[in-house]
């Protein structure tokens, strides 16, 4: 077996980002053939990624990339198992590279995105597997949203946990960004009143009806109470009916009217929403170890 020099180990480390001992192990296994070592490391990375694929990844970041003409943008949620890894430079660099690839190629879905090439030459999926092997956690590309409009797209990132894109007609990028910030804070369900799902209204009506009947008031009064609460609910969940976060004295709809602008659509992502996290019970874990 040939002697593995420190310089060769460093060369492999610079090319792969793997640890020193990991690089030395693969160089020994391939008799110092650095190209073969990289191949074997990728194979091992895929095996590690496959083993970690079932582990829940509910932390992570939201990333957004937008074209220079501000008319096309993409937003991604990329998950890790822990918040610690979500802040890791290797993870954030990967996420931003994937967002750039998504903006360049505009894939239809995550599966399509996984097959796209990064600027480094590897595919998104290959890079994901290598990152899993390097950091030891499951990494998941959870969801992707593409947006295009003839007006302007504004976006807002609250840290890296909440992301919003807003398509605006006849308005400035600054206004679109302000609306995106409002959406991040106020979490509207739809743009306008007429878009509120009938099912959501009916569910609220049932709740309000049950509450109003307990008041003991005449049915005529109860009906007016219910109608008033329904109208309030619709305003609360529709963007145009919400008080504007920067000036609660006016509603978003009024602001847009004054600016002669129109929100075409918006998308809001929040890290981990809808993912069921496993709750660790450390007492049970310790007791289980004591019993063994």
UniProtKB/Swiss-Prot annotation:
Record-linked InterPro entries: EF-Ts_dimer_sf, Transl_elong_EFTs/EF1B, Transl_elong_EFTs/EF1B_dimer, Transl_elong_Ts_CS, UBA-like_sf
GO CC annotations on file: cytoplasm
Q: Which Gene3D superfamilies match?
A: 1.10.286.20, DNA helicase RuvA subunit, C-terminal domain, Elongation factor Ts, dimerisation domain
**What keywords are annotated for this sequence in UniProt?**
Cytoplasm, Elongation factor, Protein biosynthesis
Q: Any idea what job this protein has?
A: Associates with the EF-Tu.GDP complex and induces the exchange of GDP to GTP. It remains bound to the aminoacyl-tRNA.EF-Tu.GTP complex up to the GTP hydrolysis stage on the ribosome.
Pfam families this protein is in? EF_TS
- Could you tell me what this protein is called? Elongation factor Ts
One term of GO molecular function: translation elongation factor activity
What is the organism of origin for this protein? Legionella pneumophila (strain Paris)
Annotated spans, Involved in Mg(2+) ion dislocation from EF-Tu:
82-85
What gene, per UniProt, encodes this protein? tsf
User: What lineage is this protein's organism placed in?
Assistant: Bacteria, Pseudomonadati, Pseudomonadota, Gammaproteobacteria, Legionellales
Q: Which domain of life is it from?
A: Bacteria
The UniProt entry lists the main location of this chain as cytoplasm
- Where in the cell? Cytoplasm
Q: Which CDD domains match?
A: UBA_EF-Ts (cd14275)
Q: Which family does it belong to?
A: Belongs to the EF-Ts family.
